[in-house]
């Protein structure tokens, strides 16, 4: 089976992934827009397995341990078969028995509004929410957060994500809060229909590799500790009021923000396609 984790950036999807991938039978892929892109391709592109492999490599944002040739070998079949095959290939690279993989988890914080291909599979969706004040505060601790340090821009950007989340059928999605981790895992596993067989006995998880390459994620593989309330307490009153006011202003705009979400999704896809072409040049 397949699971798709969606969230706004800096909302805890990587923490959730790190917790899930410890569970025996579950393989979590490094953050990738490949499932969304795969579901948007025409038949001509779908028939070019080398091109699909390049899109997978280019669309996976922490570098994937799967090589171009290994990815190409996974590109036969329908979307569901391809996405599951890539999970088994990753399990092999991580020294975990591929024949014991029962659930492959894909997550992204980018091409969030592109649901067509994902909905065509039998996969389920998991949406993780974090207190907006914590998400805003975190923009100042990562270089890629520079664009969202203005409260109003941040609020509109956030609501464009909520627009996308609302377009997923209710019976296909499970929503949880960052503050509910790790206790929410039991309910999540029940929703996914995944038996809890304990933890993998050996082998590294994908998030271990990600943490080695992304300095801002170096705490995800340690024991989970939620310090969000302390981080909120450090925000000055003026900032809190500005963010709350901006969020209140932007919330009624949510139903109208589909085009903004499509714009950002389109920019991500264009960048991925460009990188894929460079890989094959």
Task: Spell out what each predicted region is.
Residues 7:
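The Walker A (P-loop) glycine that initiates the GxxxxGKT/S ATP-binding motif of P-loop NTPases
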Residues 23, 109, 250:
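Acidic-histidine catalytic/liganding microenvironments
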């Amino acid at each position: 089976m397949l699971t798709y984790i969606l969230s706004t950036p800096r909302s805890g999807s990587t923490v959730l992934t790190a917790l899930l991938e410890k569970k025996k039978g579950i393989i979590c892929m490094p953050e990738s827009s490949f499932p969304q892109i795969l579901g948007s391709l025409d038949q001509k592109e779908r028939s070019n397995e080398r091109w699909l492999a390049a899109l997978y490599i280019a669309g996976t944002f922490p570098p994937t341990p799967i090589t171009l040739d290994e990815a190409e070998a996974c590109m036969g079949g329908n979307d569901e078969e391809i996405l599951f095959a890539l999970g088994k290939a990753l399990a092999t690279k991580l020294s975990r028995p591929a024949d014991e993989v029962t659930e492959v988890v894909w997550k992204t914080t980018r091409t969030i509004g592109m649901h067509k291909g994902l909905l065509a599979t039998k996969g389920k969706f998991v949406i993780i929410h974090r207190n907006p004040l914590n998400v805003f505060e975190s923009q100042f601790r990562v270089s890629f957060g520079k664009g969202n340090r203005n409260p109003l821009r941040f609020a509109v950007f956030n609501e464009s994500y909520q627009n996308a989340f609302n377009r997923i059928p209710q019976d296909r999605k499970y929503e949880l809060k960052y503050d509910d981790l790790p206790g929410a895992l039991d309910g999540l596993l029940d929703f996914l229909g995944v038996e809890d067989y304990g933890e993998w006995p050996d082998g590294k998880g994908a998030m271990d590799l990600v943490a080695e390459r992304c300095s801002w994620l170096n705490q995800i593989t340690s024991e989970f500790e939620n310090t969000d309330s302390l981080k909120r307490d450090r925000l000055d009153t003026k900032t809190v009021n500005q963010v709350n006011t901006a969020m209140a202003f932007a919330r009624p705009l949510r139903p109208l923000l589909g085009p903004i979400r499509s714009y950002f999704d389109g920019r991500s896809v264009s960048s991925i396609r460009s990188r894929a072409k460079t890989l094959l040049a």
